[in-house]
A protein has these predicted regions:
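Conserved N-terminal glycine-rich FAD pyrophosphate-binding loop of Rossmann-like flavoproteins
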Residues: 30-54
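Glycine-rich FAD pyrophosphate-binding loop
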Residues: 2, 6, 15-37
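Conserved N-terminal helical subregion
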Residues: 47-48, 52, 56-141, 147-153
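FAD/FMN-dependent oxidoreductases across multiple families
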Residues: 81, 109, 201-249
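N-terminal Rossmann-fold NAD(P) dinucleotide-binding loop
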Residues: 10-11
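Active-site substrate-recognition segment that forms the wall
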Residues: 172-203
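Central beta-strand plus flanking loop segment that forms part of the substrate or channel wall
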Residues: 40, 135, 140-170, 216, ...
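Conserved beta-strand segments of alpha/beta enzyme cores
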Residues: 23, 101, 224-226
Length: 249
């Protein structure tokens, strides 16, 4: 089996397959690296992945949902925050420890030959798991282009202010468009702020910058924009029985 993409989904799939006795190759061209992601994990997920305490940044104390001027805040103590680069690298190493082989290269070709998949012209696998994301090679190789109106865009920011409370926030109705939301996740020494919205919405980035300047004055680092599919346009039949697709949401 070959797993293309070594993020949480791909690394976990490779680990499980290796533990069950399968011969596994895990492809990823770069580790570790930061991503536009809040880094929040439920307790069940942390328990299943045997997360070490060193990978936990802080524990959630509350979660809130805000729509325009109305806010609902709920005390909780069952969620934890991780840094995606550290967390991804930990899971990647666990997959290797379980027996998965690792190929440090970008997948650029995938061809089906006599019932086996040929990867980059030199690696062979009976089955392939595509876990390299909506913009990854697997999806682009096996599916048609997804129309922009069926895509959501996501952007992530790191705000250099130490949180005074470990409150996870989800904010709706504060930015242009009818779809999407803004998230605010506390970390040990900064905030992770991001947003998810329909890619066709105009003026989103400018509106977000204005909101951040008003609510969180200070320095922040603009991360690159990423595209993440809504899931509504994916026809699984286009993958074929040998190519499941996974993501990290």
């Amino acid at each position: 089996m070959a797993v293309i993409g070594g993020g949480p989904a791909g690394a976990s799939a490779a680990r499980e397959a290796a533990q069950r006795g399968l011969s596994v190759l895990l492809f990823d061209h770069a580790h570790p690296r930061r991503k536009a992601c809040g880094g929040g994990l439920p307790v069940k997920g942390i328990e299943w992945m045997d997360a070490p305490e060193s990978s936990i940044e802080c524990e959630m104390t509350s979660i809130s949902f805000t729509f325009k001027s109305t806010k609902l805040k709920i005390p909780v103590n069952k969620g934890k925050m991780v840094r995606r680069d550290d967390w991804d690298f930990y899971l990647y190493n666990r997959a290797k420890e379980a027996g998965a082989g690792h190929i440090v290269e970008r997948v650029t070709s995938l061809e089906l030959e006599k019932g086996f998949w040929k990867i980059n012209g030199k690696h062979t696998a009976k089955y392939v798991i595509g876990a390299d994301g909506v913009n990854g090679f697997t999806r682009r190789r096996l599916m048609d282009r997804i129309p922009r109106e069926h895509l959501f865009a996501a952007g992530g920011y790191y705000l250099g202010i130490k949180p005074t409370e470990n409150e996870v926030e989800f904010i709706l109705g504060a930015l242009p468009g009818k779809e999407g939301y803004l998230w605010v996740f506390p970390k040990s020494d900064h905030y992770n702020i991001g947003y998810c919205f329909n890619a066709g919405t105009l003026g989103m980035k400018e509106a977000l910058h204005k909101l951040m300047e008003e609510r969180w004055p200070g320095e922040f680092v603009d991360r690159k924009w990423k595209l993440s599919e809504t899931g509504e346009t994916v026809d699984c039949k286009q993958f074929g029985s040998a190519i499941p697709s996974y993501n990290d949401s």
